[in-house]
């Protein structure tokens, strides 16, 4: 369920609620459900520019408690249309993920998750109405569990169409 409401001509608020279920044939310990509640406040100071701040709550329930968790996330970002048809979007996020139970090593996992992303595209470049965008994403997870701390860099091509 997604709801978007314009507070006035410059401010918009969006809320999303999701419910899902996972069922696995072989890894039945991961069977369960998940919930997401997401809120975003966007500010459009002028044409071609926007800022946003958001907060999310995600809960994953599984049969085994060492795979079940709660995740609280804060995000902020900025989008800008530049000259020559270039557009960019920059976002930063911090999340705290806390697992419900201890694993085989008797460690109850607690993660601090950091993420940044930069997206670049040309507004006049599209194919059949689909605009390609290139994104660089960096993620760092700092965990109290030695097996789950990592850094990840990704570059990917995103294809999008606005209706």
Question: Which residues does each PLM region occupy?
Answer:
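Gram-negative and organellar
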Residues: 1-163
């Amino acid at each position: 369920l997604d709801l978007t409401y314009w507070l006035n001509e410059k401010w918009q608020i969006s809320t999303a609620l999701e419910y899902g279920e996972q069922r696995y044939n072989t890894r039945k310990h991961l069977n369960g459900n998940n919930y997401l509640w997401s809120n975003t406040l966007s500010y459009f100071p002028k044409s071609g520019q926007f800022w946003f701040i958001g907060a999310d709550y995600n809960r994953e329930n599984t049969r085994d408690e060492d795979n079940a968790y709660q995740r609280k996330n804060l995000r902020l970002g900025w989008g800008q249309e530049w000259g020559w048809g270039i557009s960019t979007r920059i976002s930063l996020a911090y999340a705290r993920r806390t697992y419900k139970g201890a694993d085989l090593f008797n460690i109850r996992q607690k993660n601090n998750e950091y993420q940044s992303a930069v997206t670049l595209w040309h507004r006049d470049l599209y194919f059949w109405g689909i605009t390609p965008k290139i994104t660089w994403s960096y993620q760092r997870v700092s965990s109290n569990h030695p097996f789950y701390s990592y850094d990840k860099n990704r570059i990917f091509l995103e294809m999008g169409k606005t209706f």
